[in-house]
Amino acid sequence: MSNAKSLEQLEQTQDFIRRHIGPSPAQVSDMLSALEVSSVEELIGQTVPAGIRLEQPLTVGESRTEVETLSYLKSVASKNKVFKSYIGQGYHPTHVPHVILRNVLENPGWYTAYTPYQPEIAQGRLESLLNFQTMTLDLTGLDLASASLLDESTAAAEAMGLAKRVSKAKKANAFFIADDVHTQTIDVVSTRAEQFGFEIIVGKAADAVNHEIFGALFQYPSTTGEVVDITDLIAGVQSKKAIACVAADIMSLLLLKAPGKLGADVVLGSAQRFGVPMGYGGPHAAFFATRDAYKRSLPGRIIGVSKDRLGNDALRMAMQTREQHIRRDKANSNICTAQVLLANMAAFYAVYHGPQGLKTIAQRIHRFADILAAGLQAKGVSLKHNTWFDTLTVVSDSKADVIARALASGVNFATNRDGEYSIALSETTTRADVAQLFDIVLGEGHGLSVDAIAADIENNGSTSIPASLERDDEVLTHPNFNSYHSETEMLRYIKRLENKDLALNHSMISLGSCTMKLNATAEMIPITWPEFSNLHPFCPLDQAQGYQIMMGELHDWLVNITGYDAVSLQPNSGAQGEYAGLIAIRKYHESRGDAHRNVCLIPSSAHGTNPASAQMASMKIVVVDCDKNGNVDMADLKAKAEAVAENLSCIMITYPSTHGVYEETIREICDVIHQHGGQVYMDGANMNAQVGVTSPGFIGSDVSHLNLHKTFCIPHGGGGPGVGPIGVKSHLAPFMPNHSIINVPGTNEGNGAVSAAPYGSASILPISWAYITMMGSEGLKQATEMAIVNANYLTHELSKHFPILYRGRNNRVAHECIVDLRPLKELSGITEMDVAKRLQDYGFHSPTMSFPVAGTLMIEPTESESKVEIDRFIEAMVSIKSEIDKVISGEWSIENNPLVFAPHTQGDVLGNEWDRAYDRFYAAFPVPSVAKNKFWPTVTRIDDVYGDRNLVCACPPVETYRD
């Protein structure tokens, strides 16, 4: 057999590469022929400037099979020790209902969707997020809630920012934090305050009123477990015209009076213990609520109820003009990616258990705390407080002995305070656990009976929650929280919502700058392993050796891929990565006596988070012009760099550019900035066009953030989670984020944290680790090359029908292109919005609309899409062009055509009335391929103006279900 395959070929060691990369060799050949090149290498040579091509290949190892990868990672995970965690401090063990685990967390219909900017094809997760907001409003007792923030600590930092914006104490520049707030929250808020130039005052809660402040933060219950009435504290803060913020435990709010009812202006916290694993720190969804009067200052996305074209209720993201991509340096926050997938899990947890089920869980946790307290006090153990919900703090001279017994028993307590330790109970606590806790604290032979103590408490009651703070109002009364308590009903509810949403498991999502590539199943499997999901972020490091190995390997690979010298994995979104990178630059300048360097140059084409992040780092922004080809105007750059040379801090630049081209002058740009004493911050949003071909460090950049949820395959989750690690050159490494509880090696001791957990959203890092492992050095390079091939083929075909706005050398684009719809709009009146909505009828999510240029679509196919799917998208765009031509010719009027009526629902096309200039079948099935896999939007076009003018951000009242 002369043509027999080699053993190496039969072993299929590189099989994952062909699974990840969409086009087959034959399809690649066809695309190259269309581009009139003979090889991928020839196309790359025409596209990527020779001067920035890597001289050496990546060294992240050879590709491994899926089986090998998971087997090795399982052996690494086994080095983690999963102790019973009673550490608390914002992180608690929880039971993830299996119906949610399997059908949401492990379901690509939920985890591969994008942020719901196209609401007509996102009504499912929008409803779930509205449930999350309704849950937040009910439990906090406030008027308005957002659809999740990154974690409790960053939510507290956002609360400080809101307080400064809305407080009438305009001369005050100090923010007060009670000393019984979680340590990590004090850390993160202090980091944010340092950049804003705010003073942080940490002290006894009662002292807040003694300071000139614009806001204050209290913990409810306190980090050591005390439950106190904070009504007077809140009133005292408000008497200073300051804003009273409360970080609350979400489970406790089933039993405790809502902070809003106590007078709080802002209530925030983590929804983690509502069915989301601890995951060594994340990801978790934070909740955030405030008064209606402050709605324009609310950070994060807000889901609101509006009307569609037919007058039906429909959901959308409300008040989007507040967001960073529009407001830029004037935005309330730089937050972009939030925690939608985790918010949905928490919302489904509340839906599944309902108000009575949640209250029962909270009562059980509290009862066990009462039992534990009664037993310990009966034996003379001194408790720090007389009130509690779930956490007891023991004051002890024998702390070391108790902790030693705990560790020997596979148990963790909170030990980060001198002379005391805390025991935080959770949903997972059992009678046997309480008996074990007696043994650990008291030693053997104590003679206590859990059952006997429980009976005594049942007979005599408990005073550990003051009567004045007992919750007496009903919560979660909406039907969504009272209808789906059997698994059958819950399963169908989840499926019903999933069916309303278009995700990657249905079709290509070609959002430019978003890199919606394959999130392989093998990459996702490890995140639910208990060895990764059940660790507390503050557990002793010797219990997290598996994590340290995995994160260490990922760190080294990212260093190699980026050409930097060190990486921080702490930032839990790209925006947080930008913020952390800019802080590193500021601290570097300060260390050299150059604290005055505070000017950030930003090209006019920059992503909206860039100016928003720069203003968060208190930098002065100077905008650099772009030329007619979309490149940085070098003359303008040089002039402005020279003009601000004494105060130049950095430039923020994206590469390839946000316009989708490899700018030839990128190294010259870096040189200009360095010559004037500045640093180069390269936005990693387009790293998918660099890996293995070039790198930020090789080009000359000093720091970048990476979007692991773009280039490195963490799914977008419908709007989060994300991970935004930063890579830096050696001179910036000491200035990366540290942490107040778990020291991060290689960083200066005084560096603050930017995320609540030392390693951010650690439990999803195995996704990127697995992607790199299975692709290997060669596979990663092939992925970049194929992203470039797909983008150029798509551009070539679309250019026959639409103008392409920007191109680079040899008329090539990088990994995305911008289709200019403005000429067609002038001729026809058809807008980019009309095109985006009509694409839904063809089964596609719209590309990025009106960014970075108004009136355009930015399209990024990624390497994971086959030529078949790309051709299907091209067919849709060409068909839409023919529809626009009919409007231009007068065959269809601007008022009566399928574009302005798009999208079309089943109810629309099957309705009794039809007065359109086109037939019903064409409305829904404009090309034959649509019929093979038809996706039906569930609402017609949504009225954005109505939604903002009539803001409703909670589930509609029961009456609407009767209509």
UniProtKB/Swiss-Prot annotation:
Organism domain of life: Bacteria
Pfam families reported for this sequence: GcvP2_C (PF21478), GDC-P (PF02347)
Entry annotated with the keyword Oxidoreductase: yes
Top class in the EC scheme: oxidoreductase
Keyword Oxidoreductase: yes
Cofactor(s) this protein requires: pyridoxal 5'-phosphate
Transmembrane segments: none
Sample GO molecular function, one term: glycine dehydrogenase (decarboxylating) activity
Any one Gene Ontology cellular component term annotated for this protein: glycine cleavage complex
Gene Ontology process terms (BP): glycine decarboxylation via glycine cleavage system
Family matches, as CDD domains: GDC-P
Modified residues (N6-(pyridoxal phosphate)lysine): 710
Family: Belongs to the GcvP family.
Subunit structure and binding partners: The glycine cleavage system is composed of four proteins: P, T, L and H.
HAMAP family linked: GcvP (MF_00711)
Protein name (database record): Glycine dehydrogenase (decarboxylating)
